[in-house]
A protein has these predicted regions:
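Bacterial N-terminal signal peptides that target proteins for export
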Residues: 2-17
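Long, low-complexity serine/threonine/glycine- and acidic-rich segments characteristic of extracellular
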Residues: 44, 50-58, 63-142
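Short, compositionally biased P/S/T/A/G/V-rich stretches that sit at domain boundaries
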Residues: 29-48
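Poly-acidic low-complexity segments
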Residues: 2-4, 30, 80
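C-terminal motif of bacterial Sec signal peptides marking the signal peptidase cleavage site
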Residues: 24-26
């Protein structure tokens, strides 16, 4: 009889511990991080004068320009430029390529040389999400 009571207490304690740990694990689930990346070309790659650029976005939706929604936006490719400060509009010029239709890849043509390419994510009004939503790589165009 003593063995049975002790066994029940052990089983009850173990069950409570497992339940508590399970609940804590569920509460500790991380929120998906928001980030951007340049999936192609690879950092340090040597490419031809016309090459593919693929954008990666995590934790936000890609949507066309003009659509103002929380946690959404579209890609911009900055050529030899620093990330655009949070809240500032991404300029419209040859060094700031806009992909306002929601494109996630494109072909670009650059003359031979060394380039810094930065993916910059911005909202539907072209207002930058800042450096945390940018990624920069170096490429050599031959």
């Amino acid at each position: 009889m003593a063995f049975t009571a002790a066994y029940r207490r052990l089983l009850a304690g173990t069950s409570l511990t497992c339940l508590t740990l399970g609940l804590l694990a569920g509460c500790a689930m991380p929120v998906p991080a928001q980030s951007v990346s340049l999936l192609e070309p690879a950092d340090g790659a040597t490419v031809g004068t016309t090459f593919k650029v693929r954008f990666g976005v995590k934790g936000m939706a890609v949507a066309p320009a003009g659509e103002i929604m929380t946690d959404s936006g579209h890609n911009h490719l900055l050529i030899n430029q620093m990330p655009v400060a949070k809240g500032e509009s991404v300029p419209f010029d040859d060094q700031h390529k806009h992909f306002g239709a929601g494109q996630t890849e494109t072909m670009i043509t650059l003359p031979p040389g060394q380039y810094k390419l930065t993916s910059q994510f911005a909202n539907g009004a072209h207002q930058s999400y800042g450096a945390p939503m940018s990624a920069t790589i170096q490429v050599t165009v031959k």
